Curated annotation (Swiss-Prot):
Entry keyword annotation includes Phosphoprotein: no
Keywords on record: Cytoplasm, DNA-binding, Plasmid, Transcription, Transcription regulation
Name the record gives this protein: DNA-binding protein Bv3F
Organism, scientific name: Burkholderia vietnamiensis (strain G4 / LMG 22486) (Burkholderia cepacia (strain R1808))
InterPro entries per UniProt: H-NS_C_dom (IPR027444)
Lineage, broadest ranks: Bacteria, Pseudomonadati, Pseudomonadota, Betaproteobacteria, Burkholderiales
Record-linked Gene3D superfamilies: 4.10.430.30
A GO molecular function held by the record: DNA binding
Length: 112
C-alpha cells in the first residue's frame, strides 16, 4: 500500500531513512575531523608553551586573575518583608522607598 502524501514529493529526493543514514555518516565524519584537528591544535599549543617557557600554572594564574575582578558585591540593604537585598549599585528597588537608612544591614558587632 503506498504512503499517502508521497505522490507530491520528488521521487529523486532521498527519503526519511536515507536522510537519517546520511546524518549518521556526517556525524561520524564530524567526530573524526574534530579529533584530528584537536590533536593538531594541542600540538601547536604545546609548541608555543615550549617556545615561551609556559606552564599550565601560568595559564591558570592568568584566568584566575581575570575572574577575581568580577567579585560580587556585599549587600548593604535588606527588605525585612521579603528578604531581598540590594548592594547599593544599579537602580534603587522600590521597596527602599524614601528612607533607605531604615533598610541598612547592620554589620555583626564584636562580642564584648
Amino acid at each position: 500500500m503506498p504512503v499517502q502524501g508521497r505522490e507530491n514529493m520528488d521521487p529523486k529526493s532521498p527519503g526519511y531513512l536515507a536522510l537519517i543514514a546520511q546524518r549518521e555518516s556526517l556525524d561520524a565524519q564530524i567526530i573524526a575531523a574534530r579529533k584530528a584537528e584537536r590533536e593538531v591544535a594541542i600540538g601547536q599549543i604545546k609548541a608555543l608553551m615550549k617556545e615561551f617557557d609556559l606552564s599550565v600554572l601560568d595559564l591558570q594564574e592568568r584566568v584566575q586573575k581575570r575572574n577575581s575582578k568580577r567579585m560580587s558585591t556585599v549587600p548593604k540593604y535588606r527588605d525585612p518583608a521579603t528578604g531581598k537585598t540590594w548592594s547599593g549599585r544599579g537602580r534603587q528597588p522600590a521597596w527602599l522607598g524614601n528612607d533607605p537608612a531604615a533598610f541598612l544591614i547592620q554589620p555583626d558587632l564584636p562580642a564584648i
